[in-house]
C-alpha cells in the first residue's frame, strides 16, 4: 500500500487495470470452455472486489491531497467555494430570466385577449342572436361548452330558457371573470 501512495500514477494504472479486468470478466462469453457457473461467479466476485478496493485506495489518496491543500492553502478552498457559488448564482439568474420572459409572454397574451374582448361590439342582451358553433373563445378551463349547455353546469342539467347557447355578452363576462381570477393567481414581480 505504501508503493501505491507514493505515486498517483501507479494507483491510476491499477484502477484502470482493475476496471478493464472487471469488464472483461463480465462481458466474456465462453460457454464451451469447461468452466461452470460457480467458477465464473467466483471470478466476477474477485475482480469486482479488487476494483472496489483500488477505488477506495484512490479515494483515500485524493482525500489526503485535498486535506493537504486545505491545511497548507486554505484560500484555495475559499476560492473553490466562491466559484461554485458564482456558478449557482448564474444558473439561478438564468432560471429567473426564463420565468420573467414567460411571465411577459403571458401578460402580453392576457393583454391581447382583454383588448380583443373590449374592442368587439356586443349586441344588446335581448337581441336573441345566437352564436355559431365556431364563434367566440372557449373558456380558459378547457373545451368549449356544448350547444345548450352553460359552462360549469352538469351534463344532465338544462339551462333556463331552453337549450340555447349563452349570449355573447354572457360569454364575455365569464371570460373577463376567468382573466381576473388568473391575474390574481399570478405572483407579483
Swiss-Prot record:
Biological process annotations from GO = regulation of transcription by RNA polymerase II
Keywords, alphabetical: Activator, Coiled coil, Nucleus, Transcription, Transcription regulation
Coiled-coil residues = 75-115
GO CC annotation terms, alphabetical: mediator complex; nucleus
Is Iron-sulfur found in the keyword set? no
Where in or outside the cell it occurs: the entry states: Nucleus
Q: Name one GO molecular function term.
A: transcription coregulator activity
What assembly does the database describe for this protein? Component of the Mediator complex, which includes at least CDK8, MED4, MED6, MED11, MED14, MED17, MED18, MED20, MED21, MED22, MED27, MED28, MED30 and MED31.
What does the similarity note say? Belongs to the Mediator complex subunit 28 family.
Function according to Swiss-Prot or TrEMBL: Component of the Mediator complex, a coactivator involved in the regulated transcription of nearly all RNA polymerase II-dependent genes. Mediator functions as a bridge to convey information from gene-specific regulatory proteins to the basal RNA polymerase II transcription machinery. Mediator is recruited to promoters by direct interactions with regulatory proteins and serves as a scaffold for the assembly of a functional preinitiation complex with RNA polymerase II and the general transcription factors.
The identity of this protein, by name, is: Mediator of RNA polymerase II transcription subunit 28
Q: Which gene encodes it?
A: MED28
